[in-house]
Design a protein with these regions (language model features):
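Extended, folded cores of ATP/NTP-driven motor/assembly subunits in large transport
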Residues: 1-299
């Protein structure tokens, strides 16, 4: 990437804040921090006909697939609610089928605006730093110890790992497939723009951030994306236990929105270190009985 510090020292446009840099393989984005990401489009089981035991089983199998990812990995799950557009044209071999479709088309047009949901699963992997990569090479025989991490080797490992995870997900998802280059750019464009259209892959797939950012972002108390107002809703605290499909009512809302959930993975050892650090910080905040009595008497 070109060093823009010679021309501009501060971020001025939306593209400056986007992480995407280039397409390095089919549907795989290289980010500015050296991480790789790829996205799959999926559709889960029908919640109206599925029994609770089936949904619990699906949630358990999904957890078993994602728990294989450790430190350096992040998973993003997004649901997009968008306009369904016009009724699709169809041809039928007989008059009876055409009449049934005509009645269905009339009901579709009388109902007014229609919305549908699309679901995306994004995997992101940030390789270890150069020093950690060199230390890892010393632990295995037959590896070149004179150079650092090979970018092609890291990319092949990322592709292999994500393919294995998606194969597990395909076993219980009715529809699940990786996005190609054009579908990936189209999806990323839909996350930062209100204009819904396909994005053609450029001849040199570089500077994806500037290619996709076609609307200005205005911050402040009343944020806007282009001419559209943006409102952000976040959940401060999740309950201790939930049931699968608890947010299914969001699929019936008659307006456009994006629901995004992120999970940052940690190895067991890294998670233990983090919990120990947090526990020590809380333990350091303890107060003696004398300090409590002093606060009560002075206040």
């Amino acid at each position: 990437m070109m060093n823009l510090a010679e021309y501009r020292h501060s971020n001025a446009r939306l593209a400056d804040f986007l992480p995407w840099a280039a397409l390095v393989d089919e549907g795989i984005i290289l980010n500015k921090d050296g991480s790789f990401q790829r996205t799959a489009k999926f559709r889960g089981p029908d919640l109206d006909s599925a029994v609770p035991a089936e949904l619990v089983a699906v949630a358990g199998r999904l957890n078993n697939a994602l728990r294989r990812l450790g430190s350096g990995w992040a998973v993003f799950v997004e649901a997009q609610r968008h306009s369904a557009g016009a009724y699709p044209p169809n041809t039928f071999p007989d008059v009876a089928s055409a009449l049934v479709d005509a009645e269905r088309r009339a009901q579709f047009e009388e109902a007014g605006a229609h919305y549908e949901s699309s679901y995306f699963l994004t995997f992101l992997y940030l390789p270890p730093e150069e020093g950690a990569a060199k230390a890892e090479r010393l632990l295995y025989e037959g590896r070149d110890r004179t150079v650092g991490a090979d970018a092609r080797e890291v990319l092949r490992g990322f592709i292999d790992q994500t393919n294995r995870v998606l194969q597990l997900v395909e076993g219980f998802m009715p529809d699940c497939a990786w996005l190609d280059d054009q579908a990936t750019l189209t999806y990323l464009h839909s996350t930062i723009s209100t204009k819904r259209h396909r994005v053609r892959v450029p001849e040199i797939p570089m500077y994806i951030d500037a290619l996709l950012a076609d609307q200005p972002l205005t911050g402040g108390l009343e944020p806007m994306l282009g001419s559209a107002n943006v409102r952000v809703l976040t959940i401060v605290g999740f309950p201790g236990a939930t049931t699968p499909g608890v947010l299914d009512d969001l699929n019936r809302l008659a307006f456009s929105y994006r629901w995004s959930t992120r999970a940052i993975m940690l190895d067991k050892t890294d998670a233990t270190k983090l919990l120990t650090k947090i526990r020590r910080q809380w333990f350091a905040k303890r107060k003696s009985i004398g300090a409590i009595l002093k606060e009560v008497m002075t206040n």
